[in-house]
Amino acid sequence: MGVDLTGVQKKKRVVRHHTYSTNPYIKLLIKLYKFLGKRTNSPFNKLIHKRLLKSRNNRAPISLSRIAVCMRRRTVWLKKGKKSPIAVIVGDVLDDVRMTRIPALRICALRFSKSARERITGAGGECLTFDQLAMMAPTGKNTMLLRGRKSGRESVKHFGAAGVPGSHAKPHVSSRGKERQRSSKRRHAFRHK
């Protein structure tokens, strides 16, 4: 007779309750948004608190062009006289040189690259910090929560079995020279002899 292993199939969901970051600013923000989440009972503050606890790899950066596209979709339906919503990113905001003109955006993020900050303020926008956001919108009213792609890292492209049919994983190649092509699809004329 077999044994019914019911506990094996259950996957333990890992939830972070504290940060591993040594950054004092992030630690203060975690305290602030934990307090706001309890006091205001708003899901926005609870979500910000949850994202602040994440590791750096899970706080992916986002480009200015992506923010501009997302905000354009939201501001189409705005009535005249209403202020545009604040884009909230728990991560870094990076510049995108492919976008020549940037609209006036109000963005709150953990960090802005130097060129991104210059372009936002030059277009008539605002670069806000999370403590300023807590004063302006303590319940998250008139805000739009955005995040970058976590799968944008180079290491993610190698996840999976390379060479398996249907897999798009990149193989780890030790050398990329013409004479030493060691990847799965090397040319036979230049194979290692």
UniProtKB/Swiss-Prot annotation:
Q: Which domain of life is it from?
A: Eukaryota
The record's keywords, sorted A to Z, are: Cytoplasm, Ribonucleoprotein, Ribosomal protein
Q: Name one GO biological process term.
A: translation
State the Gene Ontology terms under molecular function.
Answer: RNA binding; structural constituent of ribosome
Question: Which Gene3D superfamilies would you find in this protein's record?
Answer: 3.100.10.10
A GO CC term assigned to this protein in UniProt: cytosolic large ribosomal subunit
InterPro entries for the chain: Ribosomal_eL18, Ribosomal_eL18/eL18-A/B/_CS, Ribosomal_uL15/eL18, Ribosomal_uL15/eL18_sf
Specify residue ranges for compositional bias: Basic residues.
183-193
Q: Where is this region: Disordered?
A: 158-193
Q: So what family is this one in? A: Belongs to the eukaryotic ribosomal protein eL18 family.
Q: What is this protein called?
A: Large ribosomal subunit protein eL18
Q: Give the source species.
A: Trypanosoma brucei brucei (strain 927/4 GUTat10.1)
Q: By which gene is this protein encoded? A: RPL18-A
